[in-house]
Design a protein with these regions (language model features):
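Substrate/ligand-engaging "lid" and interaction regions
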Residues: 1-194
Length: 194
């Protein structure tokens, strides 16, 4: 969805049901135009088919992203379909996660360079630093992939990792970024290796 896409009011902290697209989806469940409408319709079909519990995992860069996703989707569905909202209370989990990996915006020159180097025609590549940390709250509705085998950290509470990232990592990235840029670096991890 992206960190700014949850339709949560900065003033009240509540999901904004009066958004025009959200209002459309509440009235037209079978013809959604928002992420909330599409997910709700998918969950409605899952419920109708008798399929079991499911986890919705947010990897967006905001604190308590699972709690934010839960608030947004539960408020939306509660306004659209009370029966589905009750089913979700019993069958859908929204774990929190923390992802640390810088992914700068991709520019047209980046796309051209990648395609020339690799002989590809990728119109939407994602550039990122080599470092990655992915911490996931172990709160899944019906089992989960063994992500820890590929480096993810599973935990009961992501909060300590989020606080560490904000207070230590983000501050040090900011402190290091300015002299690194002046030194010719365009990635913080490259400057740290020097």
């Amino acid at each position: 969805i992206t960190e700014g896409g949850y339709n949560i009011s900065r003033q009240s902290g509540e999901f904004m049901l009066d958004n025009a697209q959200v209002a459309h989806d509440i009235e037209n469940p079978a013809k959604p135009v928002t992420a909330f409408g599409y997910v709700a319709e998918g969950l409605r079909r899952r419920k109708a088919a008798g399929n079991g519990p499911i986890t919705i995992l947010s990897c967006d860069n905001l604190q308590h992203n699972g709690n934010t996703a839960r608030k947004a989707f539960m408020t939306f569905v509660g306004a659209q379909d009370k029966e589905l909202a009750a089913w979700m209370e019993e069958n859908v989990t929204f774990p929190n996660s923390m992802v640390d990996r810088i992914t700068p915006a991709t520019r047209p020159a980046d796309i051209e360079r990648l395609n020339a180097q690799n002989g590809t025609c990728d119109e939407a590549p994602v550039y990122c630093e080599d470092f990655i940390q992915w911490v996931v709250e172990d709160n899944f509705a019906a089992g989960r992939p063994a992500w820890e085998t590929v480096g993810a950290q599973m935990t009961d509470d992501v909060t300590a990792f989020e606080n560490m990232k904000l207070s230590l990592l983000n501050a040090s990235h900011t402190l290091l970024s300015y002299p690194s840029f002046l030194g010719g670096y365009r990635k913080v991890d490259a400057a740290m290796h020097d």
